UniProtKB/Swiss-Prot annotation:
Described purpose of this protein according to its UniProt entry: 3'-to-5' exoribonuclease specific for small oligoribonucleotides.
Predominant localisation class: cytoplasm
Similarity comment: family membership: Belongs to the oligoribonuclease family.
One cellular component (GO) term of this entry: cytoplasm
Pfam families reported in the protein's UniProt record: RNase_T (PF00929)
Broad class of enzyme this protein falls into: hydrolase
Biological process annotations from GO: DNA metabolic process
Protein encoded by which gene: orn
HAMAP family: Oligoribonuclease
EC numbers on record: 3.1.15.-
Protein name: Oligoribonuclease
Keywords for the protein's UniProt record, in alphabetical order: Cytoplasm, Exonuclease, Hydrolase, Nuclease
Originating organism: Chromobacterium violaceum (strain ATCC 12472 / DSM 30191 / JCM 1249 / CCUG 213 / NBRC 12614 / NCIMB 9131 / NCTC 9757 / MK)
Subcellular location: Cytoplasm
Length: 181
């Protein structure tokens, strides 16, 4: 597939916590859509190995959530480093968008960007500096059209690929019902 400046790269990461200075990325995936939110391609879901010392430092919410999903065990068994994941995702992006053409797309995407800037800086630099954040529409809709906001159903699996697909679905919902495009 050729690069297209109108393509959007959607991203989600699972992390060991919320602080990029002490916590680490443990799972990441990307989806490419066209400007109409049609899915064009999915990256592999990359589970990133982290040492036990990092995993042991997770708070109860993260231990419980990532333990139930099986992600902690996958992280322990993974041989993929952050640097390898960064390179694979960079190569994936290069197939679909030119450098600095796509905003970083997702839900509360600034948090993913913070971790990416800390642990995958080359990948972060390939994105445009803008974000396309579904959570902005969510917050506006809750305040301006709460009856529409109630129509959004969140499954909250906290798995990278599932969360991206849910974000795209949520954006489609806001486009149709809130923005009416």
């Amino acid at each position: 597939m050729a690069q297209d400046t109108n393509n959007l790269i959607w991203l989600d990461m699972e992390m060991t916590g919320l602080n990029p200075d002490q916590d680490r990325i443990i799972e990441v995936a990307m989806i490419v859509t066209d400007s109409n939110l049609n899915v064009l391609a999915e990256s592999p879901v990359l589970v990133i190995h982290q040492p036990d010392a990092i995993l042991d430092g997770m708070d109860d919410w993260n231990k419980n959530t990532h333990g139930k999903s099986g992600l902690i065990e996958k992280v322990k068994n993974s041989t993929v480093s952050e640097a390898e994941a960064e390179q694979l995702l960079l190569e994936f992006m290069m197939q679909h968008v030119p450098e600095r053409a796509t905003p970083m797309c997702g839900n509360t995407i600034h948090q993913d960007r913070r971790f990416m800037a800390r642990w995958m800086p080359k990948l972060e630099a390939y994105f445009h500096y803008r974000n396309l954040d579904v959570s902005t529409l969510k917050e506006l809709c809750k305040r301006w059209r709460p009856e529409i906001a109630k129509g959004v159903v969140k499954r909250g699996k906290h798995e990278a690929l599932a969360d991206i697909l849910e974000s795209i679905e949520e954006m489609r919902y806001y486009r149709e019902h809130f923005l009416k495009v």
